[in-house]
Amino acid sequence: MLIRLRLKNLYSFKDAEFSMIASSSERIHSHHIYPARNRNDVRLNRFSAVYGANAAGKSNLVKALDFAQRLVLRSLPPEEKIPVQRFLLDPECAKKRPARFVIEIKHQGRLYEYGFECDQDRIYREWLYTFTRKTEQLLFERRTDPNDTTEVELKPTTSLPTKDQEFDPKFLEFVAKGTRPNQLYLRECIERNAKTFAAPYNWFRNTLTILNPTSYPQYLELGIQGDEAYRAFLNQILPASDTGISSLRTEKIKWDTREGELAREALREIPDPQTSALICLRIGSDTRFTIINDEQSTLLKLVTTHRDSNNKEVPFEIHQESAGTQQLLDLTPMMYELMVSKEERVFVVDEVGRSLHPHLARHLVELHLDSAHQKQPSQLITTTHETNLLDLDLLRRDEIWFVEKQPEGATDIYSLHDFKPRYDKDVLKDYLQGRYGAIPFLGDFLSLAPKDTNKSRFTPS
């Protein structure tokens, strides 16, 4: 689970902190909290909504996590630049100071802090700690100087999971010496089969899922075809959401058809497609395929059905559904995981309600928070403009966050809890009135209107 995120000189963040730690002074919605196991553990919120004006930096919070996840999970070619974007509106930050990413996580009952500092050329510093509320223990610290010489400090510990306790300092130092300047030591350890520090890597790989407006969930077609429980969940939630959809199914497409040729052309653009068990293709805005890399290379297409006036099912292509229905479909694998998964899951969604009706967006949040009664080890973090969620009957004060652009262009992030509004306060009204910031300061739009209102600018002269 995500505990805390600290960002320096990264995207629009000059120095910012976001936290999922549950405040001890909050007295409402205690079932939203994932409880601490003991005095050394932390209590964590299961949900956070992040508000702010357009271009204030909400999406950059998601981008920062996405950047770190990609850097951890993927190796860069030796000469490739690190795709980091520093804070560009301060020349000192943009050209001379490295970006800094620090994340605190809870994984398999243990607390870790993992961080790194980098520019486009190299990782200057990288570290991993395990900690409790009172103590911290260094596991490794890697440093790379401007001459690309890498050194690592290693600290043996018995606090790692049993299966990861094989601590061979000579081999780990050898791995550090072979770590390229643009490569994370954490990633290099995994590639060299040194699993001593695998916990944060496994968290980024198996626990964290990031969904942005262009994401396409890979489980949708596969789940419909092979997971009866997931299919039943879909066939309940879609009619209940008033989409008009009576059911979902997949159709097998032959490769020698026009649709098969479209999929084949798109497949040529994917490097090493045989390395993936499942390949999802989105061709323009109209066509979506899933390829299962089995013996037959099965090609699937998702189809919805609606009932006509004679109660007969009529098939529809996905592109014939509304944007809101398509987003709902894209979110259903996440919703299902949040409700039923026994594994730790953290979903970070950029603009969860961008095409959904406000009532439906609220219902999805309620569904996740109600599943908290079942003690699911899951979190949902979303950026949003959906003000229907700004309600203390629904959320805790420390579950509501705001981002605001400062005069120098940097993004500030803070919680509603900092303002300590009364529990009976209409926080939606106060937010729209600007009491908490994070709203746009608009100029005089009326002054932009043409002075001659009798003549349209589009009317031929």
Where are these regions (language model features)?
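A short, compositionally biased
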Residues: 1, 96-100, 119-124, 295-301, ...
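Electropositive, glycine-dotted interaction segments
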Residues: 113-271
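Extended helical coiled-coil dimerization/tether regions that scaffold
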Residues: 215-320, 435, 444-461
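Conserved P-loop NTP-binding catalytic core
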Residues: 33-49, 53-55, 62-123
